[in-house]
Structures are given as C-alpha cells and as structure tokens.
C-alpha cells in the first residue's frame, strides 16, 4: 500500500468538511446508540443511515480508484465499524432494487480493513 501523500491529506480534510456539512457528526451517535438496531434499520426511512451510506460509498469509491489513500482512510475512520451498523440496510436496498452495485465499494473497503 502506497504511503499517503500531501494530496491525500488535503482531500481527506475536504471530505471531513463535506462530512460536516452533511451532518456526519450528528449521524454517528445515532448509529452507535444502544437502541439502534442495524438489522431493522432502513436507508429509506433513516436519514443517519442514508448519510453514512452516501459518505462511506463516496470515500470508498475514491480509494477504489486510487484517488485517495486507503491507508489514510483506515487510519482516520473506522470503516468496518460504520459498515457493521449501516451494511444491513445497504444489503436490503440491493435486494429491493436488484442492483448488486449499490454500496459495493463501501462494503469492499470495510472488508479489506479487517
């Protein structure tokens, strides 16, 4: 895995700013609350799940295409932990729309981090 570059760090900061404007910092506590059930969560009904799926898939797409360092992302975010909370909702959306590409990059990044 290539060493992260200054460009990777700059992009990471931009993504962090985008995450702030999306409301990622409000979504995360909801996803990790004791009363949140990943198995019953629905991306269509839960804004926190939707935000984190979009955020995670965007970051994962950048890493997949070598536009952002996977090493840097895994040092920054607990991708597999986030996926464990929103992944079941993503899989339901895949099945509902019969579209295997939905959130595939996020899932792959989470799997590669373990």
Language model segments and positions:
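Acidic, Ser/Pro/Thr-rich low-complexity regulatory regions
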Residues: 1-114
């Amino acid at each position: 895995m290539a060493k992260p570059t200054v460009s990777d760090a700059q992009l990471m900061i931009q993504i962090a700013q985008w995450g702030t404007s999306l409301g990622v910092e409000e979504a995360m506590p909801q996803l990790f609350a004791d009363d949140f059930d990943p198995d019953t969560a629905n991306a269509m009904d839960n804004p926190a799940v939707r935000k984190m799926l979009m955020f995670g898939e965007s970051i994962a797409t950048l890493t997949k295409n070598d536009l952002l360092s996977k090493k840097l992302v895994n040092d920054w975010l607990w991708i597999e932990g986030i996926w464990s909370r929103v992944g079941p909702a993503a899989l339901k959306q895949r099945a509902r729309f019969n579209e295997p590409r939905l959130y595939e990059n996020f899932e792959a990044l989470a799997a590669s981090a373990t």
